[in-house]
Amino acid sequence: MGGLQPWHWLIVIAVFVLLFGAKKLPDAARSLGKSMRIFKSEIKEMQSDSNAAKSDQPEQITSERVVVDPSTQSTSSNSDKRPA
């Protein structure tokens, strides 16, 4: 009940032909096709630019910390002492 049946489509097509004429319909369909192609190519270009921008960013390098256990270090060594 809610969908369009085939005779509904025939009425819609007849109205378009009466309003726009038989000559203008192919031209309109052709220009719509060109517009869709241009739109799709622009979308692909934007996606490739976005992917290229992501790959151009340098990776963040995390610094490594060296943990020194104070219990293993000697508190005094001969090289640390200054002569008087």
Swiss-Prot record:
Give a GO molecular function annotation for the protein: protein transmembrane transporter activity
Start-end of Polar residues biased regions: 48-63
Q: Which GO terms describe its biological process?
A: protein transport by the Tat complex
Keywords, sorted A to Z: Cell membrane, Membrane, Protein transport, Translocation, Transmembrane, Transmembrane helix, Transport
The record's subcellular location field reads: Cell membrane
Question: Which residues lie within the region annotated Disordered?
Answer: 46-84
Membrane topology field: Single-pass membrane protein
Regions crossing the membrane: 1-21
Return the NCBIfam families for the record: PRK00575.1 (NF001854), tatAE (TIGR01411)
Oligomeric form and interacting partners: The Tat system comprises two distinct complexes: a TatABC complex, containing multiple copies of TatA, TatB and TatC subunits, and a separate TatA complex, containing only TatA subunits. Substrates initially bind to the TatABC complex, which probably triggers association of the separate TatA complex to form the active translocon.
Q: State its role.
A: Part of the twin-arginine translocation (Tat) system that transports large folded proteins containing a characteristic twin-arginine motif in their signal peptide across membranes. TatA could form the protein-conducting channel of the Tat system.
Q: Which HAMAP family match?
A: TatA_E
Q: What is this protein called?
A: Sec-independent protein translocase protein TatA
Name of the gene encoding the protein in the UniProt record: tatA
